[in-house]
């Protein structure tokens, strides 16, 4: 027999099984998408102000490109914990298992704090080695600025991991809007502090990093405040004791998110390395004054890509509570309808992005101080945008497919697709193609990887539709 508390929780969750799918997507996916886009803007905001600082410019942006993969590594841990917990909790709420839900959330809180502290320690102990691995030795100026920036970013890692892990947990509690507000508040703080610390206080790279960490601290603080006022999940002191069997299930569901991010780290390491090697062999970029341009431009292109792909991830991740609840409740017809709507939305996002990067690359680069750089900077950036992101529609659909499969509990298929994209195709092609096409090989590696991944995704999607039809 259900207690009064369990009955209240069930009533709060019931709209997931009854409300129109379009309305649920708007309620959950739009705030989630906004949160992730704003999170992606953290580093991009830094690059905009750094690019326009007279003493930083392209060298400063090259430095942030070196540090960026190490930020993504922290994000990988956060999304594994947060997305996995979100998917697990949604399934448990759909099945009416409230105890497992609150224990999973509490355990995730504890582990995210510990993981952030461990990663911060590693970053502070081995900064030079890590920066060298990710291409920091492209020239002396880039390495020096990367060291300055990375020190402060490393100090903020525990805050970043905790805040990003709690965001999907808050969504799973039925509060996607608060999750969005927590991220927006942090981004707003970063946006205000960046120009103040860089241009007024003249703190340079350190100022950009401190502004980022301050924003992360605000997001983490708001997340802590929400945990004391959850709606569907009632945390107790005992909830925060990690339970291996529950955390293992969460980790399994979040493994796709983790591998997607950590394999992106591997891909960025390979890309940065090949950029450094190929630039040294290029007639223009082998010159000292232009040597930082390829690294700086690729960093900007990747930040723009991160914003677009954050939209794609947000659309899919926002559907996790809806898909998970209906899957747990046996409503496979609604799951199938949600998948169709998601794929269509992903295609629209990708198409809009494609039009921007193909038609307006120069205008985008103006945000990043192109007017202060050489013609080589502008020409290389234009080519990178138009070629490197030419298959961004497929990239969005691929990413939506990976995450939606995760919400259905199909962790193996989701993980294999994600690994194929980032490691087999992503890393493989960025190492292979430059052997034949030099710097152009790096540029063509991403669209080629997206096309090959789309073929695999199509096969898995057909099978998923058939299984949902059979189980209806």
Descriptions of predicted regions:
Residues 16-56, 68-84, 88, 113-120, ...:
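N-terminal transmembrane alpha-helices
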Residues 44-48, 121, 165-169, 188-196, ...:
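Alpha-helical transmembrane segments of multipass membrane proteins
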Residues 37-41, 116-120, 124, 161, ...:
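Hydrophobic positions within alpha-helical transmembrane segments of bacterial inner-membrane proteins
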Residues 1-32, 89-156, 200-255, 323-391, ...:
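Short alpha-helical transmembrane segments in multi-pass integral membrane proteins
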Residues 27-46, 152, 186, 215-219, ...:
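Transmembrane helical elements of multi-pass membrane transporters/channels
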Residues 37, 41-62, 131-140, 196-203, ...:
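Helix-terminus/linker motif at the lipid-water interface of multi-pass membrane proteins
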């Amino acid at each position: 027999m259900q207690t009064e508390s369990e009955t209240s929780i069930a009533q709060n969750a019931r709209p997931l099984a009854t409300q129109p799918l379009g309305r649920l997507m708007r309620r959950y996916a739009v705030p989630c998408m906004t949160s992730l886009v704003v999170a992606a803007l953290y580093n991009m905001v830094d690059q905009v102000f750094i690019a326009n600082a007279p003493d930083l410019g392209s060298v400063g942006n090259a430095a942030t490109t070196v540090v960026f993969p190490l930020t993504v590594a922290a994000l990988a841990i956060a999304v594994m914990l947060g997305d996995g917990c979100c998917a697990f909790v949604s399934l448990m709420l759909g099945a009416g298992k409230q105890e497992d839900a609150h224990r999973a959330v509490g355990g995730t809180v504890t582990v995210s704090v510990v993981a952030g502290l461990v990663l911060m320690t590693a970053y502070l102990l081995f900064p030079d080695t890590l920066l060298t691995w990710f291409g920091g030795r492209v020239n002396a100026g880039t390495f020096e600025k990367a060291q300055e920036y990375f020190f402060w970013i490393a100090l903020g890692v525990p805050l970043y991991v905790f805040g990003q892990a709690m965001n999907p947990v808050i969504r799973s509690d039925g509060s996607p809007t608060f999750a969005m507000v927590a991220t927006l508040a942090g981004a707003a703080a970063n946006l205000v502090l960046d120009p103040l610390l860089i241009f007024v206080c003249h703190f340079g790279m350190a100022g950009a990093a401190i502004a980022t960490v301050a924003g992360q601290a605000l997001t983490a603080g708001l997340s802590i405040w929400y945990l004391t006022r959850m709606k569907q999940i009632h945390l107790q002191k005992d909830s925060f004791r990690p339970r291996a069997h529950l955390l293992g299930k969460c980790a399994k569901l979040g493994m796709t998110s983790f591998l997607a991010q950590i394999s992106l780290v591997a891909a960025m390491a390979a890309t940065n390395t090949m950029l450094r090697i190929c630039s040294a062999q290029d007639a223009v970029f082998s010159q000292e004054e232009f040597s930082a341009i390829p690294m700086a431009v690729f960093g900007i292109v990747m930040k723009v890509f991160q914003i677009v792909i954050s939209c794609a991830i947000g659309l899919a991740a926002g559907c996790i509570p809806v898909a998970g609840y209906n899957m747990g409740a046996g409503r496979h017809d609604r799951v199938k309808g949600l998948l169709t709507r998601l794929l269509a939305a992903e295609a629209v996002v990708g198409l809009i992005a494609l039009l921007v990067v193909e038609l307006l690359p120069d205008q985008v680069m103006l945000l990043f101080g192109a007017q202060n750089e050489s013609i080589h900077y502008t020409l290389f950036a234009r080519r990178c945008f138009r070629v490197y992101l030419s298959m961004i529609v497929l990239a969005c659909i691929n990413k939506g497919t990976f995450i939606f499969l995760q919400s259905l509990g199909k962790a193996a298929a989701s993980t294999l697709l994600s690994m194929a994209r980032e490691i087999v195709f992503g890393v493989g092609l960025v190492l292979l193609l430059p052997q034949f096409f030099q710097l152009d090989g790096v540029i063509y590696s991403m669209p080629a990887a997206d096309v090959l991944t789309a073929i695999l995704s199509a096969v898995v999607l057909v099978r998923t539709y058939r299984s949902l039809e059979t189980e209806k």
